[in-house]
């Protein structure tokens, strides 16, 4: 099959990867928006988990990763629920890892093990431990394919960087001992600035935070009134929305009708309607300098200051005042 990606271009995919892409769990991700509630308050915020999963697979391929690691990259988000990380707010999961906690359960009860076995791969061996896949995932604050793709993809799609900038950065990535690094402090500084546009300016955008808060309230009410079950959250965003809208539950419907692109909110630390904090997301990639690996912030005052500002903002959270619902 031929696939076309806005960042990585045209690629021919066959064999096990083609079958996995066509499988129901991966196809479902076309109906899961990356930004959770974001698309309900801004129709342009519509990157899907499917686009990101394909992107992670292609980035691992570009960096010379094995087919096995490409498989892990393609499948790493299949257990994301409807509305992505909104569900972490619903279940008050501060680590924002609900989807990781149910990953094995979702995989086992799908056709994925049969597809892998058909092509000579063992599900347990491939998918039981992400730490094996050092291009795919690294603990923060290092770079990895997952973190890199969602940052470049969102920021390109939402107009904060251009395609040339994204592709230039990708050309400045090097791989050492199975891990990815920027090849210069300039490349590191550029990515750090873009990453904080993503996790501070976008994730903590007052409109975005409002959408998360009110959709989480709607889902909590729906679960409390047995309008939906936790299992329903493994449907697509639209399927769950359809259930909520058809419920005739006044509390759920009232909350849903308050989530739309016309809402007006501001940050106000004094007269606020609600406060929300998200998972601390910091980036400080290592670079190779003077024959040793060193954190970018140890070389660049710019990276250090950006990291400190992001830390303080994330620690404080966002205080939202509603002007118009």
Curated annotation (Swiss-Prot):
Transmembrane segments: none annotated. It comes from the Bacteria. One of its GO terms (molecular function) is dGTPase activity. One of its GO terms (biological process) is dGTP catabolic process. Residues 49-151 form the HD domain. SUPFAM superfamilies: HD-domain/PDEase-like. CDD domains: HDc. Pfam families: HD. SMART domains: HDc. InterPro entries: dGTPase-like (IPR050135), HD/PDEase_dom (IPR003607), HD_domain (IPR006674). This is Uncharacterized protein YdhJ.
């Amino acid at each position: 099959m031929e696939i076309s990606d806005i960042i990585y271009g045209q690629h021919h995919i066959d064999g096990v990867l083609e079958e996995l892409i066509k499988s129901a769990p991966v196809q479902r991700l076309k109906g899961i928006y990356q930004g959770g509630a974001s698309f309900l308050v801004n129709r342009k915020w519509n990157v899907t988990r499917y686009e990101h999963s394909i992107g992670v697979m292609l980035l691992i391929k570009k960096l010379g990763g094995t087919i096995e690691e490409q498989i892990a990259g393609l499948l790493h988000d299949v257990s994301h629920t409807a509305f992505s990380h909104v569900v972490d707010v619903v279940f008050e999961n501060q680590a924002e890892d609900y989807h990781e906690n149910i990953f094995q359960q979702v995989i086992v009860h799908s056709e994925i093990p049969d597809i892998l076995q058909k092509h000579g791969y063992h599900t347990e061996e491939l998918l039981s431990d992400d730490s094996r896949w050092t291009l795919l995932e690294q603990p923060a604050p290092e770079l990895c394919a997952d973190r890199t793709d969602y940052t470049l993809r969102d920021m390109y799609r939402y107009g904060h960087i251009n395609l040339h900038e994204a592709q230039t950065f990708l050309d400045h990535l090097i791989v050492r001992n199975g891990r990815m690094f920027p090849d210069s402090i300039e490349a590191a500084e550029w990515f750090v600035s873009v990453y904080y546009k993503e996790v501070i300016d976008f994730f903590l955008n007052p409109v975005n935070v409002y959408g998360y808060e009110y959709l989480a309230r709607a889902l909590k009410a729906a679960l409390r009134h047995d309008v939906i079950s936790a299992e329903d959250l493994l449907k697509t965003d639209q399927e769950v929305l359809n259930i909520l809208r058809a419920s005739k539950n006044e509390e759920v419907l009232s909350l849903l009708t308050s989530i739309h692109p016309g809402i007006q909110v501001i940050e106000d630390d004094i007269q606020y309607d609600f406060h929300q904090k998200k998972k601390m997301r910091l980036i400080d990639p290592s670079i190779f300098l003077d024959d040793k690996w060193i954190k970018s912030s140890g070389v660049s005052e710019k990276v250090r200051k950006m990291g400190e500002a992001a830390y303080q903002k994330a620690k404080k959270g966002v205080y939202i005042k509603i002007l118009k619902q």
